[in-house]
Amino acid sequence: KIRKNSKGKKKFILHDGPPYANGHIHMGTALNKILKDMIIKFHQMNGKDSIYVPGWDCHGLPIEWKIEERYKKKKKNKDEIPIKNFRKECRDFAKEWIEIHIQEFKRLGVTGDFKNYYSTMSFEAEAQIVRELGKFLLDKSLYQGFKPVLWSTVEKTALADAEVEYLDHTSNTIFAAFKIKNTDKDFLKDANVIIWTTTPWTIPANKALAYNQSIEYSVVEIDNLENFKEKKIIVATNLLESIMQSCKIEKYKIIKKFNGSDFFGTSCSHPFLKIGYDHEIPMLEARFVNLEQGTGIVHCAPSHGPDDFNLCLKNNIPSKYTVDNAGLYTKEVPTFPLIYRATPQWFISMEKNSLREKAIKAINQTNFYPKKGKERLMSMVEGRPDWCVSRQRVWGVPLPIFINKKTKEP
């Protein structure tokens, strides 16, 4: 009736950012919908044809988890359920919660055309996604790459940054010694480069050490070897005192101070040399190395971190699989007793066909309320890496790409 009476007037359209269809609305959802309804009604009372377009986000892990919980209660194995059946259950589950949400929104007094809502799981929406993906494939913006991505070892899938919440966690840290193997500097011979890491499990994936040429380093001789097995070590001069305190070493002396540039051409042995890690570890210059914490030398595991990956890629150092889908070490880890993770994924390039430039232009043409929203979105787009669009899951829009089983090429 409102639409009929408002026909011909200037339109104001609020296209809703969709809630997720997997449970009852909460206080945040209610606040969101009430505020939007107030805006819609204000413009309607102000003489406009004010339209609210409701919608729901229906794909993804949260709904899969709910269906998996049902299987667990019935003592069923999800992997034994035909994919077609699993997807139907996910679709039915999402549809059920959309209907519940509609009733809950109406109880809040929200006005909208709830008979003609949009949903990401509608066949029309899924078909449009495939069409748009095809455009990226044809203009070569869509490509398969091997990069570190956020990985869930429980669900065995890549994740988006927006799907992750960072929690404070206390982890064990270690210092590790990399014995210098090759160098043209006499004062570096027989010394051990010391690194500090909060992720000891990445040591088997180490392929390089990073230093900063503008940092001053010291060759140090330790008298008390109780906490360090190596007598001659190398760390950043400015961090030496804190390292000695952390390791409870009281007696030591500085043999020589030198600039990071003297590391050029130096390579080390892996700490696990005696159990099969016989590859050389080159020392590489990197500006991301700083004096905020650690030793001033960074251990690089290219399959577990974006900075490490990019540095090794730049220096033609290959990554290798050391952790599988479940977060367990693979057979690539030699004779070792038993997470960013580098995996082959599909990406949309932000640089190809000026996608980043187009996105920034669109942001600048948009009015934001409040204006801080623009700053936040702009910073995300300006600095974001290529967009990982693939997931190792069932409930989503499949990538319509065929892979040759023999060559593994698309």
PLM feature segments, named:
Residues 1, 68-204, 224, 265-268, ...:
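Residue patterns forming the tRNA-binding/recognition surfaces of aminoacyl-tRNA synthetases
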Residues 1-10, 248:
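Histidine-rich, glycine-flanked metal-binding segment
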Residues 6-67, 129, 195-202, 282-311, ...:
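N-terminal catalytic cores of NTP/NDP-binding nucleotidyl/phosphoryl-transfer enzymes
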Residues 46-47, 247-250, 316-318:
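Structural alpha-beta junctions
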Residues 169-171, 213, 261:
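Short, surface-exposed loop/turn motifs at beta-strand boundaries within globular domains
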Residues 208, 215-297, 306, 310:
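Protease-associated
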Residues 210-212, 316:
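Short, solvent-exposed amphipathic alpha-helical segments in soluble enzyme
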